[in-house]
Amino acid sequence: MKRSSLLKAMTAALTAAVVFTSAPAAAIAECTQFWIPAQYTANGSRYVARDEDGAYRNFKTYGIEPSMDNVEYYSHETNFTWTSDKTSYRYSFVRDPKDQWDDGPNAYSAAGINEKGVSCSATLSTDYNDAAKAADPLNGESGIGEYNYASIVLGESATAREGVELIGKLVETYGACSCDQLTISDPNESWVLMVLSGHQWAAVKLPADKASVNPNMSNLRFAA
């Protein structure tokens, strides 16, 4: 696709996304992911982004998580816990305010970037059908979920691929409490990781010749 054609297509797609994200909360309460590869941007940068569509305003806190030994990650969604066996990487974070999570010290991290240049944005909520649910149900008691994805990726991963493999391993081992998509990037590549069911996941390296806007198509809800 020629650059001008792609820009026209992206303008239309982004306009549609604005319509979705400007809709009342009753109409949609999920997220929207964006991907624009380097060859389609004026400055040669890749853009991986996500907005939260669950409310008109989503207040966030910004900060730096220091490097620490043997970090214990735990969730306020479930009873999930996992302890690292190494020294974590220092990273910046965008988190929910603590008072939204019972004043826990490790409130849900929506995005961030670590000292190795690995970034993560989590999540876009998805769903599974009845057949998948019967075969591999979600682990709502102790499964990993969006509360921990970004913190674990940023604290433990030196590359995007390493982050993908780590989250995949944790999903297989502990199960997941929800179906989600998250993006993980480093200076060389970007990935979308999809948690499909209780213990199944898939990941795709985002292509250099295609752009996308994903308005949570599998989970859209419309007002009557």
Mark where each language-model region is.
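Bacterial N-terminal signal peptides that target proteins for export
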Residues: K2-A13
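Intrinsically disordered and other compositionally biased segments
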Residues: A12-T15, V19, Q181-L182
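C-terminal segment of classical bacterial N-terminal signal peptides
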Residues: A17-A27
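Hydrophobic transmembrane signal anchors and adjacent membrane-proximal interface regions, especially
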Residues: V18, Y91, I152-L154, A202
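A contiguous strand-loop segment
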Residues: E30-E146, L166-A224
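N-terminal leader/propeptide and maturation segments of large enzyme subunits in energy/redox metabolism
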Residues: I144-A160, E165-L166
